[in-house]
Amino acid sequence: VDELRTKGVSAIMNEIETKLSDCDIIYVSFDVDSMDPDLTSHGTGTPVKNGLRPEEANEILTVLAKNKKTVCIEFVEVNPCLDEKANTMAEITLGLIETVLNEYK
């Protein structure tokens, strides 16, 4: 996350897309544990302090969803039973899913 914040999401995603350019297909498994629980919630198994901000996750997933080689994007580790903020993690994840569906062509 430090490198992402230093270089910026756009620069990091350019690097990632370059590394993925030789792949035939891209399968993304987005673990919501990667998002900062102070900005989202603890509605996941292993919250990561100082993780991704929701807007960073949104930008990352938008780039991946637009990539013609992306065949699947899954979202894992949402656990409403652990959410102290009334399903906030599920709602944030739903927003990310909506972004992906709007961008995926």
Language-model regions, residue ranges each:
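Catalytic cores of soluble, metal-dependent hydrolases
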Residues: 1-105
